[in-house]
């Protein structure tokens, strides 16, 4: 993709910030198609289980909350100032899914060795057909463009390993996951199936009231207890599982005695939850700290916080995402 065109797209998107809101950015359909095609080639050229190095900043669900994505970058540093890993769910629910995914794809193309995107359960045609992305594409462009995004999403990697110690994915563990080569060997492009390893990596949830595996209230995949987290980490000589997929009040929440963390990066999710958003910073020594993007309060103030020593709390089962 032409560097000048790419830089122009990034500049347009980043400069959309208008006080506390972001204005709609109209990119040409041709430019968006080019973003999808170029990003797809890069996704397929890199492994399905990315092997990354710290320092890196890890972000959870963004869900079309474009102004909050820009706030994350303002706080963490716009690429290439920092390395980033996003854990999926870029589209649906929020008002600006197109701007959100286009900026993320543009950064992936420009900084392919420093900026990484995993697949979430909403990067799937059968889900984003229902929860807003299809309608946004159809209203602002056309259904063909939605199909182009689908082709791109079907090539996204599904997990990442940071310094061989922190395993990251959107959803969680799978009863089918015995070794990490199984993730490396998932063929792409692929649609998300209704069950099995790929489905679980994108859909599973931890459950503090459970031992072993349980039924998931979502009607898809499983829930897993702290025992399964400990067993998996010990077997693979890992320190931590980092995942997203659930709204948590403080933007991050520990589980299984700090062996698993949920990171959620869309504050005031859907305008319905009063949650904060968080970004997890992993430094060279693999120490994790959390930068908090507070939900704007009634007076419209925006707050930031930094916390690296919160006591662990189990994932909250309220909001589903």
From Swiss-Prot:
InterPro entries: Calcineurin-like_PHP_ApaH, Metallo-depent_PP-like, PP1_catalytic_subunit, Ser/Thr-sp_prot-phosphatase, STPPase_N
Domain of life according to the entry: Eukaryota
Binding site for Mn(2+) 2: 89, 121, 170, 245
Pfam families registered for this protein in UniProt: Metallophos, STPPase_N
Annotated region described as Disordered, given as residue ranges: 298-321
Gene3D superfamilies for this protein: 3.60.21.10
GO cellular component, one term: cytoplasm
Co-factor: note: Binds 2 manganese ions per subunit.
Catalytic residue positions: 122
UniProt KW keywords: Hydrolase, Manganese, Metal-binding, Protein phosphatase
Binding site residues for Mn(2+) 1: 61, 63, 89
Any one GO molecular-function label of the UniProt entry: metal ion binding
Required cofactor(s): Mn(2+)
Chemical reaction(s) catalysed: O-phospho-L-seryl-[protein] + H2O = L-seryl-[protein] + phosphate; O-phospho-L-threonyl-[protein] + H2O = L-threonyl-[protein] + phosphate
EC number: 3.1.3.16
Family membership noted in the UniProt record: Belongs to the PPP phosphatase family. PP-1 subfamily.
Protein name: Serine/threonine-protein phosphatase PP1
Annotated source species: Medicago sativa subsp. varia
Gene: PP1
